[in-house]
């Protein structure tokens, strides 16, 4: 009886609304993102998770989203990825309303690294490249960039390319090889390794927009710094929205979006915000215990971009 009730429960779940306009094959070509007067709530009688949110992100811009728990940070990611429908407002990517884009097309066009990465029962290779589109060299390349294998010089990768029987353990990676077993949910990996694998998978796709929801929260500072360096150096033209607990992770981004109670409170360069004692961001940096370091990093970033 319980099984029948559960089946009935599943059949009654409303389908996700789907779009009907197929964009060009190269969409999104640039990666401009705009939210305009967006309001979202998760149930009819709940308070708004997002309340009249508006901001623009130019193509290639790196935006750090910060705020206290429940401020609406993750709801922004959920809305852009259309995991939740909104009650009013619009989201456009390259001037196209994403509500009109078929869901599969939309989600295949955006890289998303969630708080809890999804990994499948299989191997490292099948998790990174489920459709067998990439060579071992390309896969090893992204594993190296995110720090899951030790730094390997170019000759090593050329060896792999030219000699199919080249022993992959010579790469001295944390995995035995690409056929290393990954259990369902990545239960045989640490939280940090799961997030790093998810980042590597996203990098293989080479999409113009990447959404990162607290992806480095469980990773040590050294690994976090390597990831952020990789993002900046290899994704210069990618539009990135990152939710981060560690202000250091986003202090040298192009913009900081400060959320509070579902509303946008501040949106500017980190140095501009941290220099103003009246901003919420200034207070968050003070409370972090590393204000002086954050201030200096923000200033260097600001000066370099002038």
Swiss-Prot record:
Residues annotated as binding ATP: 67-74
Ranges where the ABC transporter domain occurs: 33-286
Family listed: Belongs to the ABC transporter superfamily. ABCC family. Conjugate transporter (TC 3.A.1.208) subfamily.
UniProt keyword ATP-binding, yes or no: yes
Gene3D superfamilies according to UniProt: P-loop containing nucleotide triphosphate hydrolases
GO function terms (MF aspect): ATP binding; ATP hydrolysis activity
Keyword entries, A-Z: ATP-binding, Nucleotide-binding, Repeat
Protein name per the record: Putative uncharacterized protein YKR104W
Keyword Repeat on entry: yes
InterPro entries: AAA+_ATPase (IPR003593), ABC_transporter-like_ATP-bd (IPR003439), ABC_transporter-like_CS (IPR017871), ABC_transporter_C-like (IPR050173), P-loop_NTPase (IPR027417)
Biological processes per GO annotation: transmembrane transport
GO cellular component: membrane
